[in-house]
């Protein structure tokens, strides 16, 4: 009779454990909550210099336009019967660049201009800018997701060269009267 080493037994147990866990019953309260998901591409351009004036500048763009699942926004974990309400995105941008003015671009006509928001919760070292979606949401039965009828696109120019830009993006969506939020942060570097 051959004996197995302890190592091969432990190795086999490690592979078997996930299969056992995968079949465990998950209680109903553990189901995922609705969320405003998607990809907003934040782009910090390389510094450029105006040939006439010699002034340096950097362009910062927030681009949510594109096709699912690579770009855009969508509400997940909400049934076809859900009511999707107030939706907004607040972009906290490092105060080292001063207060910015954004231009709306692309087909973001259902989004309010991304503008300074004095009512947003204060984040030390950041200035808040908020846009609100004023369009309608359409349910896609194939993906079981809700999609807005337009996607955000904003751009601004900073009148100097920037090599890093700390940002925090906070997303908020109301589903059946409850507000759900999601936040992501990072430091942008020129593309």
Regions found by a protein language model. Give the residues of each.
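N-terminal secretory signal peptides and thylakoid transit peptides that target proteins
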Residues: 1-17
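C-terminal segment of N-terminal export signals and the immediately downstream linker at the start
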Residues: 24-53
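Short, solvent-exposed loop/turn segments enriched in Ser/Thr/Gly
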Residues: 53-72
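Buried hydrophobic-core signal for structured, non-transmembrane domains
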Residues: 71-76, 168-170
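A short beta-turn/strand-edge loop motif at beta-sheet boundaries
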Residues: 79-86, 99-102, 162
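A surface/secretory-pathway sequence property marking extracellular, secreted
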Residues: 87-133
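Low-complexity, intrinsically disordered segments enriched in Ser/Thr together with acidic residues
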Residues: 125-164
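Short beta-strand elements
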Residues: 168, 175-191
């Amino acid at each position: 009779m051959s004996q197995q080493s302890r190592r091969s037994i432990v190795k086999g147990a490690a592979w078997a454990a996930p299969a056992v866990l995968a079949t465990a019953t998950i209680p109903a309260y553990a189901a995922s909550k609705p969320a405003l998901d998607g990809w907003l591409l934040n782009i910090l351009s390389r510094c450029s210099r105006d040939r006439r004036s010699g002034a340096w500048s950097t362009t910062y763009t927030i681009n949510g336009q594109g096709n699912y699942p690579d770009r855009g926004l969508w509400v997940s974990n909400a049934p076809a019967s859900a009511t999707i309400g107030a939706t907004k995105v607040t972009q906290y941008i490092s105060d080292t660049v001063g207060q910015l003015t954004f231009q709306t671009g692309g087909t973001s006509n259902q989004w309010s201009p991304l503008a300074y928001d004095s009512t947003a919760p204060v984040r030390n070292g950041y200035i808040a800018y908020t846009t609100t979606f004023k369009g309608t949401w359409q349910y896609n039965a194939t993906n079981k997701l809700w999609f807005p009828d337009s996607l955000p696109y904003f751009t601004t120019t900073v009148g100097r060269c920037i090599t890093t830009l700390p940002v925090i993006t906070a997303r908020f969506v109301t589903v059946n009267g409850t507000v759900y939020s999601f936040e992501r942060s990072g430091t942008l570097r020129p593309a």
